[in-house]
A protein has these predicted regions:
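S-adenosyl-L-methionine
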Residues: 1-76, 108-145
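Conserved class I S-adenosyl-L-methionine
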Residues: 78-87
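Glycine-rich SAM-binding Motif I of class I
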Residues: 89-93
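Gly/Ala-rich phosphate-binding loop of Rossmann-like dinucleotide-binding domains
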Residues: 96
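Conserved SAM-binding motif I beta-strand of class I
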Residues: 101-107
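A short SAM/SAH-binding and catalytic strip from SAM-dependent methyltransferases
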Residues: 143-156
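C-terminal substrate-binding/active-site "lid" region of AdoMet-derived donor-dependent transferases
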Residues: 154-225
């Protein structure tokens, strides 16, 4: 299973591979992407893995399809949205183009990030960053919805975001399930104890989701009690 990249040497390796790999474009229809095991069984597996490294460096961990972006835009229409830990800001930029009022917040500006540091992800492009700092400091605020995509593994960030939200705010989470390589156990326990899941919205986002090989990420939507 792919784990979050934390070691500086691994970040450097990904950035090197990303320089020569062809681009895997995000935002295409779901039918354009191989997914999961199909990817691993492809005769172009080596090329696809190299493309994934470039994708990590330029976009992030989540393979966003056109259908998922459409579903998010529909779900978020007319809402005030905070993306907590926006990374490259690619998703926030696309949603902003769709008229969504979204604020992209991240404590790392990857345009100026120290690559010798073990903090953060191997991202080298930033499409949108509205707030450079800890997104938790912006909560609860006047936001209707908080978007949390691939929060850092085995850190308290995801849990802190969920705890800082107020009753009635909606969380849209994308990442692996409990025991996977996003967030920590306390975050998932807090979701169970403090949020009401929204099954229909979760299914709508997940039905056209595509995954990288070895990754079991998915969408989850819930409202804080």
């Amino acid at each position: 299973m792919f784990e979050m990249i934390a070691e500086a040497t691994e970040i450097s390796d990904i950035l090197e591979a990303a320089k020569v790999a062809p681009l895997l474009a995000p935002g295409l229809p779901a039918s354009e992407y191989l997914s999961g095991e199909l990817w691993e069984c492809s005769h172009q597996a080596d090329l696809l893995f190299a493309q994934r490294k470039r994708f990590l460096a330029e976009i992030g961990f989540c393979l966003l399809t056109a259908e998922v972006i459409d579903a998010l835009a529909t779900l978020l229409a007319g809402k005030e949205v905070l993306e907590a830990g926006s990374g490259s800001g690619w998703l926030a930029a696309r949603l902003g183009e769709r008229g969504i009022n979204i604020l992209a917040a991240d404590w790392t500006d990857y345009r100026t990030a120290d690559r010798s540091s073990k903090r953060g992800y191997p991202i080298r492009e930033v499409f949108r960053l509205d707030y450079h700092g800890n997104a938790v400091d912006l909560l609860p605020g006047d936001y209707d919805t908080v978007l949390l995509v691939w929060p850092n593994y085995e850190t308290q960030f995801a849990g802190n975001v969920a705890c800082a939200m107020r009753s009635g705010q909606t969380l849209i989470y994308e990442g692996e399930s409990e025991g996977g390589c996003t967030a920590d156990q306390e975050f998932f326990q807090y979701l169970r104890n403090s949020f009401n899941p929204s099954l229909s919205e979760t299914v709508e986002l997940d039905k056209n989701h595509r995954r990288f090989p070895g990754v079991d990420d998915k969408w989850w939507v819930g409202t804080k009690r």
